[in-house]
Swiss-Prot record:
Signal peptide start-end: none
Positions contributing to Mg(2+) binding: 8, 95
Known cofactor(s): Mg(2+)
Biased composition (Basic residues): 867-883
Chain residue ranges for the region called Interaction with DNA: 175-180
Protein name as annotated: DNA topoisomerase 1
Source organism, top-level taxon: Bacteria
Matching Gene3D superfamilies: 3.40.50.140, Topoisomerase I, domain 2, Topoisomerase I, domain 3, Topoisomerase I, domain 4
Catalytic residues of the enzyme: 320
């Protein structure tokens, strides 16, 4: 009889099958086979009347979780049970972390095997690793199971207790989460700091100097013995120099006068300093640092990074990608050092094998950092990988190799020059030995730090040299507000604060964006007005749940539970049902929370209130005793909402939109408006005969304040015909779409060939020759390209394909015109047709319930003001069921 091996995914099954004897049968569980109920329909009929049933956790009975087998997993469970009937041994080979241990435990509970059962663990899928794992099987680790279950229960209690409160008090569909809400608050706090920021300005001088050996640059350092002010000397809340700072602050007039005075004065080298330094390579990747570097260097989201890493792991290219450890095994160190010696030579090897120590208290040193799999590392170009998979493997390979390379040696150079009563400083850097720089330089959110492998050479100088000043310029500077978080910097902050676990960061950030708490704009996470409202409510009424210190202590308690140092049941009881437990706090606070106040976003200094409505944020003010409401554009951020913007939106609402001018051909007025999706121009007013007048969005770089009448007429004429294709005779046009300006060639039969315009192209002036040049270039995918990641199957209703695509916010399912985010617990390689159909049906139902929404400010004939239509180790018995 065969031995049955169960893993999570078909990809992992295919890979591991290659390394097992022929009498082993490998099946995939497709992830979790049991979970807490996701909706009321999942709850067994006999339990629907229980007070706790909606939680899916029996808080009256030692927090016993109610586990159900989802509908889309019942067929899988049956397949596994049938396979087990023909097996003489069961081997559970799910991932080695808490989640994997939990899947194995649930499989045991469901399958109830009557044959010997083993737990097989490995951190890479290679022949050597699989053979070693087979010889060293163990039992399911109940501590890991309990740890995962406690986290799951705690997350459910927080989410399912607080979210309904948010629905009642702010808006339906909002959610709160143990880690999610803390992460959102971090974004909101940074945005508040940006609103409170006051800009300061300062001036300095920059000199271009020459000596016989060459040219160099120097900047003003001191004046009359006092250090010149820089941006770091300003108070962000006042825009003034921080009290007590003894610095020299120059304005434009003073800087220019100083420039004129110093230009004719002699310059002399006062001192030289050379300081040798060394730089050590960064440790190999953990889950967190991989997400950070991938975001900085590859512009991959945390979610996409983990998806690609999962694929690389399951196909045997890298070790397990969910780890807090920076430890490398002896075989990995030897493999890395062998690569270094072969590619760069012995002198680029570190003198001794370098081993890193994991700082995380709960990281397991038996686990390894993320590295290329195997006893020898495949070169990136020899893997056959492409796209994001190649880029991520290349990143992991380089980081691992660099960890065993010699330190980089460099010399920091500093030259002080004096001219009259001023001192200038020239700085340089000489790389004496590049060491690990040859392979890898760690990324940084600081652009200056990101250039640390670049030399800045100075000509040969000595004290007393008299350089000639070729040019002296006065340069103005303005201080900048605190930078918004990128995915990389948010992940780093969460890890530094001890909030959540790195393995969950990708899904947390994805959820924040999916739920509308943040927008991803130019790789930065910008919180929405809804995020402000929810954070304010939680800060006022449930401050512990969004406090970083409290969250870190909670995370530590959960780790202590997993280590057997803390009992899980008293902890849960105290958290949820204690005197100041969550259950009691929600009961007490619910009546105190005024919905009108909760829906109001507190932004100081504005002549209107910002409120959260059914369809998003809007302004509310009064004029002549009458209330005025105006929708806020979706791309408008809380930090950028100022008095001028508020007044413009309200004025458009009361007086109608501004009129730019009259169309030279139709004599119709051209209006300037702002809608939910940004600024646009409109030709004429809306009438019964013409309810939808011609509109055109403003392209990037154009604003309502600067657009000319000629430009507006041009935009309203789009798409414009440029001519015919010389080979096919088909029409070529230029236009403006959701992805920006483009040219398009009609191919006939409803098919069209599009190309985006380049930065230097203008949609209003591009000609046929340039359009043909663009159309001749290879077509690029925008992420929502024509090539799906996977086709799940045919929809049972219309036999149309259901496909998985990659979008700006992660992976999504597509069926016809309906798109739905890939469910959090599902993987693109393993999601079943039934689950995909259910997710699409739920999304279609939401869209139908919500209806549509039109933009603001459309003038109607005969009206003086615009109108807006808003359509816009546990001893308890777990409850289980397979219904």
């Amino acid at each position: 009889m065969p031995k049955l091996v169960i893993v999570e995914s078909p990809t992992k099954a295919r890979t591991i099958r290659n390394y097992l004897p022929k009498d082993y049968r490998v099946e995939a569980s497709m992830g979790h086979v049991r979970d807490l109920p996701q909706s009321a329909s999942d709850i067994p009929t006999e339990l629907k009347g229980e007070k706790w049933s909606n939680l899916g956790v029996d808080v009256e009975n030692n927090f016993a979780p109610l586990y159900i087998v989802p509908k889309d997993k019942k067929k899988i469970v049956k397949t596994l049970k049938d396979a087990l009937k023909d097996a003489d041994e069961l081997i559970l080979a799910t991932d080695e972390d808490r989640e994997g241990e939990s899947i194995s435990w649930h499989l045991l509970q469901l399958l109830q095997p009557r044959v010997p059962t083993k737990r097989m663990v490995f951190h890479e899928i290679t022949q050597e690793a699989i053979q070693a794992a087979l010889k060293n099987c163990r039992d399911v680790d109940q501590r890991l199971v309990h740890a995962q279950e406690t986290r799951r229960i705690l997350d459910r209690l927080v989410g399912y207790t607080l979210s309904p409160l948010l629905w009642k008090k702010i808006a339906w569909g909002l959610s709160a989460g143990r880690v999610q809400s803390v992460a959102v608050r971090l974004l909101v706090q940074r945005e508040r700091a940006r609103r409170a920021f006051r800009q300061g300005s300062y001036w300095d001088l920059k000199a271009q100097l020459t000596v016989e050996a060459g040219q160099f640059e120097a900047k003003l350092w001191t004046l009359a013995g006092q250090r010149l002010a820089t941006g770091n000397d300003f108070d962000e809340s006042t825009g003034q120099i921080i009290a007590g700072r003894q610095v020299c602050l120059l304005d434009q007039q003073e800087a220019e006068a100083l420039r004129d005075r110093l230009q004719t004065q002699p310059w002399q080298v006062k001192s030289l300093e050379e300081k040798p330094t060394t730089r050590k390579p960064a440790p190999p990747f953990t889950t967190s640092t991989l997400q950070q570097e991938s975001n900085r260097k590859l512009r991959l989201s945390a979610r996409e990074t983990m998806r690609v890493a999962q694929s690389l792991y399951e196909r045997g290219f890298i070790t397990y990608m969910r780890t807090d450890s920076v430890h490398l095994s002896q075989q990995a160190i030897e493999a890395a050092r062998s690569c270094v010696e072969q590619m760069y030579g012995k002198n680029y090897l570190s003198p001794q094998p370098r081993q890193f120590t994991t700082k995380s208290k709960n990281a397991q040193e038996a686990h390894e950092a993320i590295r290329p799999a195997g006893n020898t590392f495949r070169l990136p170009q020899e893997t056959g990988l492409s796209g994001a998979e190649f880029a991520l493997y290349d990143l992991i390979w380089k980081r691992t190799i660099a960890s065993q390379m010699a330190e980089a040696r460099q010399t920091m150079l500093s030259v002080l020059l004096e001219v009259d009563n001023a001192e200038f400083r020239a700085s340089g850097k000489r790389i004496d030995f590049p060491g690990f720089f040859r392979a890898y330089v760690e990324g940084s959110d600081d652009p200056d730090a990101a250039l640390e492998d670049r030399e800045i050479l100075l000509p040969a100088l000595k004290v007393g040299d008299r350089p000639t000043c070729q040019e002296l310029a006065a340069i103005g500077h303005e201080t900048q507000p605190p930078a918004r978080y990128t995915e990389a910097s948010l992940v780093k902050m969460l890890e530094n604060e001890g909030i959540g676990r790195p393995s969950t960061y990708a899904s947390i950030i994805g959820t924040i964006v999916d739920r509308g708490y943040a927008q991803l704009v130019s790789n930065t996470l910008t919180p929405t007005f809804t995020a402000f409202a929810v954070t304010a409510l939680l800060e006022q009424h449930f401050p512990d749940l969004v406090d970083t210190s409290f969250s870190a202590r909670m995370e530590q308690s959960l780790d202590d539970i997993s280590n057997g140092e803390v009992d899980w049941l008293p902890y849960l009881s105290q958290f949820y049902r204690g005197d100041r437990g969550l259950e009691e706090q929600v009961k007490l606070r619910e009546s105190e929370i005024d919905p009108a106040a909760a829906r109001t976003v507190a932004l100081e200094g504005l002549p209107a209130k910002v409120r959260i409505g059914r369809f998003g944020a809007y302004l509310e003010a009064e004029a002549d005793g009458e209330p005025i409401k105006a929708n806020l554009p979706k791309e408008l951020t809380p930090a950028d909402l100022d008095v001028q913007r508020v007044e413009t939106l309200l004025r458009q609402k009361t007086e109608g939109p501004d009129q730019l001018g009259t169309h030279p051909e139709t004599d119709e007025p051209i209006y300037l408006l702002t809608g939910a999706y940004g600024p646009y121009v409109q030709l004429g007013a809306a009438t019964e005969e013409k309810p939808k007048p011609k509109r055109a969005s403003l392209p990037k770089g154009m604003s309502l304040e600067t657009i000319s009448l000629e430009q507006a007429v041009g935009l309203l004429s789009l798409p414009r015909t440029l001519g015919e294709h010389p080979e096919t005779g088909r029409r070529i046009q230029a236009g403006l779409g959701r992805f920006g300006p483009y040219v398009v060639c009609d191919l006939g039969g409803g098919e069209k060939d599009y190309r985006s315009l380049k930065a230097d192209d203008d949609v209003l002036t591009i000609d046929l020759d340039r359009a043909l040049e663009l159309l001749a270039q290879p077509k690029k995918s925008r992420g929502r390209g024509k090539e799906p990641i996977r086709e799940v199957g045919l929809h049972p209703d219309d036999q149309a394909p259901i496909q998985i695509f990659e979008g700006p916010y992660g992976l999504y399912l597509k069926h016809g015109k309906v798109n739905a985010s890939l469910p959090e617990d599902e993987k693109p390689e393993t999601i079943s047709l039934e689950t995909a159909v259910a997710a699409l049906a739920a999304k279609a139902g939401q869209a139908k319930a919500k209806g549509g929404r039109r933009s603001t400010g459309t003038p109607k004939s005969g009206e003086t003001k615009a109108r807006t239509t808003k359509t816009t180790k546990k001893t308890t018995t777990r409850r289980t069921t397979s219904r």
